[in-house]
Amino acid sequence: MNRIANYVLATAFSAGALHAASLPSTNTTTTYRRVQVDGIDIFYREAGPENAPTIVLLHGFPSSSREFDTLIPLLATKYHLIAPDYPGFGLSDAPSPAAYTYTFDHLAQTMSDFLEKLKVGHYTMYLHDYGAPIGFRIILAHPDQLHALIIQNGNIYKAGLGAKWTRIAEYWADPNAHPEVLNVFLSLEATKERHVAGTSHPARYNPDTWISEYADLSRPGQREIQGDLLYDYRTNVASYSEWQAWLREHQPPTLVAWGAHDPSFVAPGAEAFRRDLPKSEIHLLDAGHFALDEKTDEIAGLIIQFMAKHPG
């Protein structure tokens, strides 16, 4: 009897393995890769035909390239998608601040070197949250490589800074005197709020998302890493006027798809792009900071329409 049971199990496992081995891999299949960049192991997602127009997806805080999991399959039939995790985020290496200086300048340099390593020299950039200051540094260093911009709650205007930034500015003035600001910034409550604040559809939000992000923030060394980056964020605000001037001069095709209920980067930050980019497309969505949480289909549709108007 045992021999019969073993035979049945072996047959089932063999059939399953054969079926798995025969499953086709298509250009729309997301692949999960790693590459060494400046001594750092960088994790990234990739999908779509390599000869298609490339969209580089730069994630926000405290997420990773995983925030694009629902968007990538909707775009991968037409575009080549690359979504890296920054050092200190997601599945990329997180060296200590003694081994890697956590500034937005340094993250941008590492991501620029990452794109060079992958031989990606012409792209549209999708910038969310932290992706905006990282992306604009890359763009200003390599303006000839940019085809178009997709901005999703990625702020470069003082008008876009929500009320919470008043307290963060106190942290910038003296981090040691305001540890409570960093405590709140890294808390589970704040991590959840970045997703659900202002939404009228809380049941559409998967709690696994912020629980996982909070687990990442609770890893050894993360307080120091994220504290350094929060302190360095002041350099982004100081750079806003430079980035705005670049937009006015170069007028890249730009799509702004902005969650209107974001308490961090409020709606006037989206509308301000029109001042410097009169031809930009601006859409305020019934969503929050992580607009992809509930507006993936709508954002994908906007991107496909936008890219069709600006081929290349």
Feature-to-residue mapping (PLM):
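Serine-hydrolase catalytic-loop signature spanning alpha/beta hydrolases and amidase-signature enzymes
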Residues: 62-70, 81
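Bacterial N-terminal signal peptides that target proteins for export
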Residues: 1-8
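Active-site glycine-rich loops that stabilize anionic/oxyanionic intermediates
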Residues: 60-63, 129
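Hydrophobic h-region of N-terminal signal peptides that target proteins for export
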Residues: 11-21
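Structural cue for short, hydrophobic secondary-structure segments
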Residues: 57-60, 83
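Catalytic histidine-centered segment of alpha/beta-hydrolase-like enzymes
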Residues: 288-300
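Flexible "cap/lid" subdomain of the alpha/beta-hydrolase fold that forms the substrate-access gate
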Residues: 22-33, 39-42, 47-54, 82, ...
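Alpha/beta-hydrolase active-site loop signature
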Residues: 62, 87-90, 156, 288-291
